[in-house]
Amino acid sequence: MPPKEESSKVTRRSTRSSASVTVENSEPIESHTPTIDDLTFGEESITIDAVLSNFPGRRSQIFDFIRLMGPLDCPTLPIMIYGGASTGKTSVVLQVLRHLNRPFVYSSCRTCYNPRILFESILNQSLLHRKCSLNGYSSAKRCDKPSDFVNLLREALSSVIKTLESTSETSRSDKPDEKPMGKMVYLILDNVDLIRDWDKGTIILQFLFSLYTVLKMPQLGIILISGLPPDVYYSNMGYTDPIPLYFPEYSEEDLRQIFLRNQPNRKLYSAFLDVVLKPFCRVTRRVEELSTTFSLLFRKFCEPLDDLGISPNEDMKRRLYSHLKPLIAHCLNEIFRVSSHPHDGETRGERRQKASYSSENREELEILDFHMSTSAKFLLLSAFLASRNPATLDASMFDSTGGMDNRKRKRKASEKSMEKKEIAEQEAVMKGPGSFPLERLLAIFQCIASVGDSSFGEEDEEEENTTGYDKENNNLMSDILLQVSSLCDANFLIKSGSCPLEGSIRYRSMVSEDLAQKVAKSLSFPLSKYLYRR
C-alpha cells in the first residue's frame, strides 16, 4: 500500500485495493491543504455490527483488538497483529480504526522498501504534507538515519497531538453527535516481516521495536502487522515486547460465509461450494487464490442453466457436478503449482513452474527438466503413493509379488458397481490427496527403493561392475530426513498438521500424477503397478 499522502481524500483508505491505486494528480487534489481530518478515513464511521459482518470468522480477533486499544485517550502498549497471508489482518485493523474514528499513520514495508522511504512516508503523514507538483513531489523532510527520524517524528507527533487536543475541545461543543477522535495517534507498520530482507534489516527491526520506549510518548500507539510470529523478532535489546494478537487461517465454514456474501442466488452458490470448497481447502485457504479459481469454476458450473435464479434440487446438483468434474482436477493441479518465494528469484520460480502440471505445455514436459537425487525421487514417489492409495492396501500393494496382481479375472461391471465407483470417484475428488505419517512414508520408501535397487543391481551384473550400485545402495537411506525437509521447502510435500492421538506430524503430497509419472520414468520404476485405481 502506498504512503497515505498520495491517496485522495474522498476514497481515503476505504479498502486495501483502493488504497493501492495510483491517483491521478489533478488541480483540485493539489490545491487541497491537508488537515488533521486526513489522519482518519475522511468518511462516516461504521458500526461494530458492520465490521463484524464484513469479516466472518474474525469476531474474537476484532473484539480482542478493540480491547487492547482501550477506551478513548487510553495509552496502550505496542500491539503485534500476526498470521498467515490473506487472513484479514490489515483490513480488520483499518476498519476497526474507522469504526472508532481514531487518527492514524499507515505505512507498508512492501511499498516503502527501504528505511529512507519508510521514514519519509511516516513523517509526511505526521506533518500533514502531501506530495504534488507544487512542491516538486518532494518529501517534507529528508531522513536516512534512525536518530534523525526519532527527533523529527517526536516534533511532528507533538504538533499533531496539540492539534488533536484543540480539535477535541472544539468538536464537543460544535458537533456533539459526532464520534470524537481523541488525543491519541496510532502508527501502523504493515508487512514488518519484509524488513528482515533489507540491508541491515535486523538493526532497523530492533529500532522499530524500541521506538515506543525511545519516544516515551503515551499519546502514541504502535501497531505492527506481520506474517511471522513475535518469536522470530526476539532480541535482548530491552525494548517493550509488543502484545501479540494471532489471526489464524480461515476455517472451511468461515470461507463459506465469505464467499456467500453478496451472492444474488445463495442457494445456487451454496450448492457450488458443496462441491468445490472441501477439496480446494486442503490445498490453500487464501481467499484471493480461491476467489480467482472459484470465479472460473462457477461460470462453468452454471453453463447448463438457463435461469440463474433457480434453487437446484438433488438431481440438478448431480448433473451440474458431472458438468464441472473434468475441470476440478485441472484447477486443483493449477493451485498445486509451486510458486517461488519473493526472495528466491526468477530462475527458481521458473524451474518450479516447469515442474508443475499444465495441460498447455504437457508435450514440452515429457522429460524431467530439473535435477533431483535418486533418494529424493523415490521419496517423492513414496509420498505420491501414500497420498493416493488407501493405507489399508499397503500390505497387498507392497507384498513380495511386487504390486497389485493385474492378472485377476475381470468381471462385467454391474450398474450398481458402476454407481458405487462413480460415488467413490466423487468422494476422492472432494477429499483431495490424503495425509500420512512419516512412518508410513518411510515404509513405502523402503519397499519401492528396494525394487529400484533390484533393477539397478541387474544392470550392474550385466556390466560386471557393482561398485556404483553398492555405493548408491549404501547411501540411499543416509539423507532421507534431510530430503523430507527439502521436499517440504520446495512445496512438493506440505505438513498438514499433527494427529491428536499419535502426536506425530502428518504430510500430504502436492505432486500431480503427470509429474510423478515423469519421475518414475527417469528411474525406470513401474509406478502404475503400485497405484490404486478405483
Swiss-Prot record:
Entries under Pfam families matching the protein: AAA_16, ORC5_C, ORC5_lid
Tissue-specificity statement: Follow a cell-cycle regulation with a peak at the G1/S-phase. Mostly expressed in flower buds and cauline leaves, and, to a lower exent, in roots, leaves and stems. Expressed at low levels ubiquitously.
Domain of life from the UniProt record: Eukaryota
Biased composition (Basic and acidic residues): 414-424
Record region (Disordered): 1-36, 397-428
Leader sequence segment: none
Record motif Nuclear localization signal, residues: 129-136
Binding of ATP, residues: G83, G84, A85, S86, T87, G88, K89, T90
Subcellular location: Nucleus
GO MF annotation terms: ATP binding
Chief localisation class: nucleus
A GO biological-process term: DNA replication
Upregulating conditions: Accumulates 13 hours after cell cycle reactivation by sucrose addition following cell cycle arrest mediated by sucrose deprivation.
Protein family membership: Belongs to the ORC5 family.
Function: Component of the origin recognition complex (ORC) that binds origins of replication. DNA-binding is ATP-dependent. The specific DNA sequences that define origins of replication have not been identified yet. ORC is required to assemble the pre-replication complex necessary to initiate DNA replication.
Binding partners and assembly: Component of the origin recognition complex (ORC) composed of at least ORC1 (ORC1A or ORC1B), ORC2, ORC3, ORC4, ORC5 and ORC6. ORC is regulated in a cell-cycle and development dependent manner. It is sequentially assembled at the exit from anaphase of mitosis and disassembled as cells enter S phase. Interacts directly with ORC1A, ORC1B, ORC2, ORC3, ORC4 and ORC6.
Name of the molecule in the record: Origin of replication complex subunit 5
Species per Swiss-Prot/TrEMBL record: Arabidopsis thaliana
